[in-house]
């Protein structure tokens, strides 16, 4: 199936320490594919369109201290469906990633970064919602010419979040009929990892 898209963007550099990229875009698909949880496959669901704005920022505070943040705004809709029943299941509407990093060729280096996704429709009428999340990860390393020792932390605040999630029918033993509701795989809880690397 055909896909048609266009975008327009600008790159701004207000100073030698700041870089900003802003792009507006539009995408039209002759055929959208939607994940079917029960079957574990994707199936065609008609035409769709998306329009959005992406913002990318980069900052350099010092020779070794950096930061970045990306913001992605999207309005995804099915074409030819009535308003209120034209949502695209699981299509993100707002996501963002970013962080602050200290980078050095040797000695201590590391950073902290975040991941965010907003609540989004899990079915066509938005009666079932896929839950968003905000997670923080961090890492610190000690680097020498011959080796590196590091410690990484995922989900620092031990937030309960859903990783894979979708709307599908299920029925418990005491229920008279199947119910369409959110099914999900729990996301990784707080996790720490020790790293040792040897350079040859």
Tell me the role of every PLM-derived stretch:
Residues 123-129, 136-140, 181-182:
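Short, glycine/charged-rich beta-strand-loop motifs at protein surfaces that mediate ligand recognition
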Residues 67, 119-120, 142-200:
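C-terminal beta-signal and adjacent terminal beta-strands/loops
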Residues 1-51, 60, 160:
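Membrane-embedded beta-barrel scaffold of Gram-negative outer-membrane proteins
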Residues 30, 36-44, 83-92, 127-131, ...:
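Flexible, surface-exposed loop regions and adjacent strand-edge segments
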Residues 14-16, 61-63, 75, 106, ...:
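Short coil turns and loop connectors of transmembrane beta-barrels in diderm outer membranes
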